[in-house]
């Protein structure tokens, strides 16, 4: 292992932001970039009237609706560290894409709307993080508005999300009376002033909770703050780094992302406490981040990041070694060597050629159709990284087009969108219509919009009488052939060439499983594994 690789790995922090829709996640992403100096001015999320859009929301449908649908990747430097920030889709229909992004990070920042508390999508996403014991930092947002009681919010996080809370800052008031926060570990009070353009050095600081200046500044609030802090210190958990790294305890910060308040404390905590890249599971062995040889896996494919170029980019998480532009690397699933000369790094949809990258970094490989989600790359060693699943879709539509002459464009568009993971595409073994599967209705809207904008195809989706899908496999090829013959009307091939059973209802699926005990019905499948 070289000292250079070890030093670079220690400098890396790779994290995702997770939240329920409208908790302020995209605003927070903007402000983190602003505070790090990566951008000069924050775009206004949902800025339909001003025409300003968030830096991380770039697809047409996102600009129209003010939601993050695709996951953006942004790299920036802060305090001598390289930070890779993955902005995940906040809309609940995109849990599958979000899950895949969470396989590529080492920690997560959870944003909670303090007026609403823990919401459904937050629960789902935290459960995904828990599968990998991902360390979580929590930000209670929107204290410039009327919000719920802060102690109640902590109790709710502990009860519902089953993770212990350690408050690091504590709010002084809320809404019109929001005065700032007290930093418990530093014994400092940061004074709040409204306004979205302020940078960290522009907020006032008072040292010490017993400083006489506090009585003069806010005589009504200071005694309440002291009482609350006494209560919090008696009733809450102290911050413990080992428990945080094990995913058992979350440090909690309070603030207002839209006013840039509380942002620097979060950034500092991610640099000081969040883990550097960790070893990764592959089928043959664990792969350490400081190993000399390059390796990585694809967790996302995005079509048409630049509609002018009709391109597709495969997002690769570097797991070990050092990537250098022009190096030879092996695409292991198809056993093909590629020269990595046009690999890029990201600042949302602004791209630059990547000269080098280390474990934790995200690089983009131009994809002409050969790369799939879950594929592994190395300098030659046969590694297959694990833990990137497809989920059985819950909603289904059949697809037809208004102009039959555009069938080729439809097929190409759906194949690309299917590989990207925006939607699952099934080709029934009998019947001409393609079937789309998704985990939420918005995915169909996104596909309709992207087929029209990027492929010039007007598609019509009709409801399909399918309740659920299961991938099927059997070691006995003869029995599998019998099963295929007997159930041809319910079988389809997915974009990865895997056989799937499309069940019209729960009873049908149960009966079919009983009749065919040798056939295995899978609710998930690994991306890189053909059943």
Curated annotation (Swiss-Prot):
Coiled coil: none annotated. The keyword Transcription does not apply. Keywords: Cytoplasm, GTP-binding, Nucleotide-binding, Protein biosynthesis. Residues 10-278 form the tr-type G domain. It comes from the Bacteria. CDD domains: RF3, RF3_II, RF3_III. It is found in: Cytoplasm. Its main location: cytoplasm. InterPro entries: EF-G-like_DII, EFG_III/V, G_TR_CS, P-loop_NTPase, PrfC, RF3_C, RF3_dom_3_sf, RF3_GTP-bd. One of its GO terms (cellular component) is cytosol. Pfam families: EF-G_D2 (PF22042), GTP_EFTU (PF00009), RF3_C (PF16658). SUPFAM superfamilies: EF-G C-terminal domain-like (SSF54980), P-loop containing nucleoside triphosphate hydrolases (SSF52540), Translation proteins (SSF50447). GTP binds at residues 19-26, 87-91, 141-144. One of its GO terms (biological process) is regulation of translational termination. Increases the formation of ribosomal termination complexes and stimulates activities of RF-1 and RF-2. It binds guanine nucleotides and has strong preference for UGA stop codons. It may interact directly with the ribosome. The stimulation of RF-1 and RF-2 is significantly reduced by GTP and GDP, but not by GMP. This is Peptide chain release factor 3. It comes from Neisseria gonorrhoeae (strain NCCP11945).
């Amino acid at each position: 292992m070289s000292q250079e690789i070890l030093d670079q790995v220690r400098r890396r922090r790779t994290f995702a932001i997770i939240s329920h829709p409208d908790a302020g996640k995209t605003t927070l992403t903007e402000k983190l970039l602003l505070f790090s100096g990566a951008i000069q001015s924050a775009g206004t999320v949902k800025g339909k009237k001003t025409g300003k859009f968030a830096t991380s929301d770039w697809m047409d449908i996102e600009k129209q609706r003010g939601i993050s649908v695709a996951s953006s990747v942004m790299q920036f430097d802060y305090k001598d560290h390289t930070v890779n920030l993955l902005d995940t889709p906040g809309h609940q229909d995109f849990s599958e894409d979000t899950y895949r992004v969470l396989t590529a990070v080492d920690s997560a920042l959870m944003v909670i709307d303090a007026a609403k508390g823990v919401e459904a999508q937050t629960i789902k996403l935290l459960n995904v993080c828990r599968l990998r014991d991902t360390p979580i930092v929590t930000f209670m947002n929107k204290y410039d508005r009327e919000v719920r009681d802060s102690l109640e919010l902590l109790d709710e996080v502990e009860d519902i999300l089953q993770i212990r809370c350690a408050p690091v800052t504590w709010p002084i008031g809320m809404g019109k009376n929001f005065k700032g926060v007290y930093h418990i570990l530093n014994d400092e009070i940061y004074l709040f002033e409204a306004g979205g353009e302020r940078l960290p050095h522009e907020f006032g600081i008072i040292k010490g909770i017993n400083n006489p200046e506090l009585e003069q500044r806010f005589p009504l609030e200071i005694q309440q703050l002291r009482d609350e802090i006494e209560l919090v210190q008696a009733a809450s958990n102290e911050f413990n780094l080992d428990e945080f790294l094990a995913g058992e305890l979350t440090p909690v910060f309070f603030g207002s992302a839209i006013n840039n308040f509380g942002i620097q404390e979060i950034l500092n905590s991610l640099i000081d406490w969040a883990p550097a890249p960790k070893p990764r599971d592959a089928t043959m062995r664990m792969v350490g981040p400081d190993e000399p040889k390059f390796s990585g896996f694809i967790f996302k494919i995005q079509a048409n990041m630049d509609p002018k170029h009709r391109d597709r980019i495969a997002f690769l998480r570097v797991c070990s070694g050092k990537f250098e532009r022009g190096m030879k690397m092996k695409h292991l699933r198809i056993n093909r060597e590629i020269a990595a000369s046009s690999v890029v790094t990201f600042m949302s949809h602004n791209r630059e050629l990547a000269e080098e990258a280390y474990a934790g970094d995200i690089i983009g490989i131009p994809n002409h159709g050969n790369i799939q989600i879950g594929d592994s790359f190395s300098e030659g060693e046969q590694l297959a990284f694990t833990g990137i699943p497809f989920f059985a879709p819950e909603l289904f539509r059949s697809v037809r087009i208004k102009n039959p002459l555009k069938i080729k464009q439809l097929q190409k568009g759906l194949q690309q969108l299917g590989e990207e993971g925006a939607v699952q595409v099934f080709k029934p073994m009998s019947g001409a219509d393609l079937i789309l599967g998704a985990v939420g209705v918005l995915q169909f809207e996104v596909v309709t919009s992207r087929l029209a904008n990027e492929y010039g195809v007007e598609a019509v989706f009709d409801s399909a009488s399918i309740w659920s899908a299961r991938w099927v496999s059997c070691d006995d090829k003869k029995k599998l052939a019998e099963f295929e013959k007997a159930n041809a009307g319910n079988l389809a091939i997915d974009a990865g060439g895997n056989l799937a059973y499309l069940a019209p209802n729960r009873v049908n699926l149960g009966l079919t499983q009983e009749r065919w005990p040798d056939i295995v019905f899978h609710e998930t499948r690994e991306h890189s594994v053909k059943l």
